[in-house]
Amino acid sequence: MSEEKYIMAIDQGTTSSRAIIFNKKGEKIASSQKEFPQIFPQAGWVEHNANQIWNSVQSVIAGAFIESSIKPGQIEAIGITNQRETTVIWDKKTGLPIYNAIVWQSRQTAPIADQLKEDGYTDLIHEKTGLVIDAYFSATKIRWILDHVPGAQERAEKGELLFGTIDTWLVWKLTDGAAHVTDYSNAARTMLYNIKELKWDEEILKLLNIPKAILPEVKSNSEVYGKTAAFHFYGGEVPISGMAGDQQAALFGQLAFEPGMVKNTYGTGSFIIMNTGEDMQLSENNLLTTIGYGINGKVYYALEGSIFIAGSAIQWLRDGLRMIETSPESEALALASTSDDEIYVVPAFTGLGAPYWNSNARGSVFGLTRGTTKEDFVKATLQSIAYQVRDVIDTMQIDSGIDIQQLRVDGGAAMNNLLMQFQADILGIDIARAKNLETTALGAAFLAGLAVGYWEDLDSLKELNETGQLFKASMNESRKEKLYKGWKKAVMATQIFAEE
């Protein structure tokens, strides 16, 4: 009898790396997680040691094998999903990074982005890449490293250096330098990739003086990129055959294959992505246009809205205000609130994300009375997450012309039933919470498995990640719109207060 085969997903995140082994039913068999240090050289700067990331990945691969007793030879394929935009540049010969990885959150390259805006390149960048000019994306991070590491520009021009986002770095390491590749979803977040023509954009490269020689080859999200070097995978030469940035991987893991399907991941922040199909739709309302995934010779585009503060608002209640001891307590406290007062917490602790993009805004609270209780305040904080999601969903419907019928949800805060019910109420649509909340890793596993025939096709996946719970809207229309109107007033007042 032959041994059962599995798919391994490597989920490389901002604070930790994970390896998860899935079976053919999409069930998690084993997982391992390891955190790694965050580096803060100056206020607003965030960096990682790329070698520490690689070491953490090696550690969790071993951990998953130890936990499961599965052998490397039983892994049919590997899928990789990763923190997006984070930038590594390394020496092609030695494999050593020439500087720390600059993390997506880091603002150290903001002056480069500001200069591009001042020079009038906003429309050009938007039309070609679907993005806004921001330090968030990889392009300014590459330019910063080439400017600040002595001799780096010259070495890049000679072809001695390589650039990659974290997916590229991990594939290069796992294959022992045999493959220097990225995928559509990660390339689309560099601010260098023309998402319409599906190629690195010569005009933008010239504008930023970034040599094309350092860039990886861009591949689809589901194909064999290379095989693990045996000494990096405990003797196994296993195909690496699926890759996607974390939010796009979650879109795929949520089985959002049709235009108009939308998923939201309630993590530290909230990332809402809508599949818009094979037509690229540029947002006119401050959403990002990006590539969802490319598979079977087709590319599917997406609209994305990023909310900076979601689950971290609950952490603030716990660590900052000390109103709760654990995050799950927030639900019980909010349920105990008996007030109908319209209290609004606008958690703009680091500014407002989509669709406002106001980096000067700061947190505010409206509607407090002498009778306001801790329970009321916790409920208002939870509701702020749902209001922000509605801001993005309404904008997506305007941009796409698609009437959204359902929101598929995952992430830690999606386990909060009160939040999910209020989300359904304030949107007036169904909220479908996945039974398996490991949708990001599952998406990477699905992409890898499809490429090697482990799963036959998209239809064969649809029965694997069924809905765990459906939340249906129950609030009447006038109450819903009255509450949301109050939220819009609170956000407007918050922005006015932030004006200089």
From Swiss-Prot:
| Gene behind this protein | glpK
Q: Which UniProt keywords apply?
A: ATP-binding, Glycerol metabolism, Kinase, Nucleotide-binding, Phosphoprotein, Transferase
Say which enzyme class the record assigns: transferase
Entry EC number(s): 2.7.1.30
Q: What is the lineage of its organism?
A: Bacteria, Bacillati, Bacillota, Bacilli, Lactobacillales
**Biological pathway:** Polyol metabolism; glycerol degradation via glycerol kinase pathway; sn-glycerol 3-phosphate from glycerol: step 1/1
Query: What does the UniProt record note about how this protein's activity is regulated?
Result: Activated by phosphorylation and inhibited by fructose 1,6-bisphosphate (FBP).
- Tagged with keyword Zinc: no
Cystine bridges: which residues? none
**Biological role stated in the UniProt entry:** Key enzyme in the regulation of glycerol uptake and metabolism. Catalyzes the phosphorylation of glycerol to yield sn-glycerol 3-phosphate.
Q: Where does sn-glycerol 3-phosphate bind?
A: T14, R84, E85, Y136, D246
Record-level Gene Ontology MF annotations:
ATP binding; glycerol kinase activity
Keyword flag Nucleotide-binding:
yes
The subunit field of the Swiss-Prot or TrEMBL record says: Homotetramer and homodimer (in equilibrium).
Residue positions binding ADP: T14, R18, T268, G311, G412, N416
Identify this protein by name.
Glycerol kinase
